Amino acid sequence: MAAALRPSNRVLLQALQTLVYPGVGGSGSVSCRCPVGAKRYLLTDNVVKLKEFQQKKVAIACNLSGTKEMYFRNLKEKLTQNKLILKGELITLLHLCESRDHVELAKNVIYRYHAENKNFTLGEYKFGPLFMRLCYELNLEESAVELVKDQHLRGFFSDSTSFNILMDMLFIKGKYKSALEVLIEMKNQNVKFTTDTYVLAFAICYKLNSPESFKICTILGEKALLKGEILSRRASCFAVALALNQNEVAKAMSIFSQIMNPESIACVNLNIIIHIQSNMLENLIKTLNNAAEGNLSKFVKRNVFSEEVLAKVREKVKDVPALVAKFDEIYGILHITGQVTTDSLDAVLCHTPKDRKSHMLLLNKRMFSRRTSQPLSQSLLAE
């Protein structure tokens, strides 16, 4: 299996370099033909943890003995005098930074700290996510990219969370090519891809919307399957959308068929686009009709369709009188039942789901009786 994976590793790396560095083994520059659309967060708050970071910043600043200026001055003196930088000092510094100048000092301290501790990284504190959250807060993604790609800091950003947060930053700002460079660096540093990484990678490729990005997306997906990894529904939806944008309908259908529970709003609308591009017009109208006339309880979630996607349906069936008449009837019903959204397909794809863990925390909080402070199960039995 390992031998079988090596060629695809080379192919993937070559494809990545071709897209990011057009002059290297490629066929010219790549332009982003896909509109930027909704610049939303792809990562949930549970991953970025910006609010928790900001709360901790306030707490550390309040408990600081002396002023911030004194703390910064002491660290500058340590750098000048080649004194040892302690872990706690760097943690505090990253929580005190409030400007680009402060971050420049933090970068110098990071270089010194890593040079002193790079041989003792096993079980060491992960500074990467902390620095990324700081850059996230201050809109300093360029500083984050600079440090991630610096060979002198190899091992400092050894976790997937650091790379994922940085790619999310770049994605939000429409810097898809830079985000792809970070993905390349992540792969070069052998940092493990997580579920979030695949979502970000496929979303970046979808936004770039080129034959090269489609190739990268395809290879990444195939390698994930070879490793026995299960791609999330969100990641698969971006892959399907990219395949459809590249008129690779068969590939889009293949990826879509592997999605478990294709009942999300993104899946529902992608399925309609697949029908349109496959010229399966009668099945298309039948699918819409079933969604509009289903005898569902008001408590059962109905399928919701993008106005943009429905416009594509009408354009497709406009030359078939029987179908266009039926579509207009269905279209009216869908509006009456509240099954049409003005969100574009791009906005639907880039929409960030709510944190599941936050809901679980709320549930866990109610596992104990407020009156007796006992587990609810015991409290109910006692009553």
Curated annotation (Swiss-Prot):
One of its GO terms (cellular component) is mitochondrion. Its main location: mitochondrion. The keyword Mitochondrion applies. It holds the Pfam family MRP-S27. Keywords: Mitochondrion, mRNA processing, Phosphoprotein. It is found in: Mitochondrion. The keyword Chaperone does not apply. The modification Phosphoserine is found at residue 377. It comes from the Eukaryota. GO terms for biological process: mitochondrion organization; mRNA processing; regulation of mRNA processing. PPR repeats lie at residues 161-195. One of its GO terms (molecular function) is RNA binding. Involved in mitochondrial RNA maturation and mitochondrial respiratory chain function. Belongs to the PTCD2 family. NCBIfam families: PPR. This is Pentatricopeptide repeat-containing protein 2, mitochondrial. It comes from Pongo abelii.
